[in-house]
Amino acid sequence: MRLVIQRVSKAAVHIGGVCAGAVGPGLLILAGIEEADTEEDVRWLANKAAAMRIFSDADGKMNLSVREVSGSVLVVSQFTLHASTRKGNRPSFIRAARPERAIPLYELFKKELASLLEGRVESGEFGADMQVSLINDGPVTIFMDSRKRE
């Protein structure tokens, strides 16, 4: 499972012109699931994302987590995080999990985050054509991969 975590002043996801979720301040998390991912991967990343200290403390040092600042989280499914660009110029998404595998793990990720955070957890709709808007704060962008545990 791969995540792109962005610290945001605000973020929103629209589906068909209707706002499906909005947060701020907090995190926008793009989540990509591959076939080999497990519930353990999901739980590890949910715990890391909730505890990652990327918000400033009183001294301006990145020392607080989204949990500690009671921030909100917007989770958006993003199968393209598993794109392979090895051959040619057209990305291959063969490593991305099929919906029947990915949806239960995506739902578990949101549930795990919600159980860890006092702030809101909002989301887009898995597999939908979505428009995501955000205002980066910093910017701070972190990439995580459960396979590499980094």
From Swiss-Prot:
EC primary class: hydrolase
Compartments it resides in: Cytoplasm
GO cellular component, one term: cytoplasm
MF (Gene Ontology): D-tyrosyl-tRNA(Tyr) deacylase activity; Gly-tRNA(Ala) deacylase activity; Ser(Gly)-tRNA(Ala) hydrolase activity; tRNA binding
GO terms, biological process: D-amino acid catabolic process
Motif (Gly-cisPro motif, important for rejection of L-amino acids): 138-139
Enzyme Commission identifier(s): 3.1.1.96
Self-association state and partner proteins as the record states: Homodimer.
Function text: An aminoacyl-tRNA editing enzyme that deacylates mischarged D-aminoacyl-tRNAs. Also deacylates mischarged glycyl-tRNA(Ala), protecting cells against glycine mischarging by AlaRS. Acts via tRNA-based rather than protein-based catalysis; rejects L-amino acids rather than detecting D-amino acids in the active site. By recycling D-aminoacyl-tRNA to D-amino acids and free tRNA molecules, this enzyme counteracts the toxicity associated with the formation of D-aminoacyl-tRNA entities in vivo and helps enforce protein L-homochirality.
PANTHER family: D-AMINOACYL-TRNA DEACYLASE 1 (PTHR10472:SF5), D-TYROSYL-TRNA TYR DEACYLASE (PTHR10472)
Note on domains (UniProt): A Gly-cisPro motif from one monomer fits into the active site of the other monomer to allow specific chiral rejection of L-amino acids.
Protein's recorded name: D-aminoacyl-tRNA deacylase
Record organism: Akkermansia muciniphila (strain ATCC BAA-835 / DSM 22959 / JCM 33894 / BCRC 81048 / CCUG 64013 / CIP 107961 / Muc)
Gene: dtd
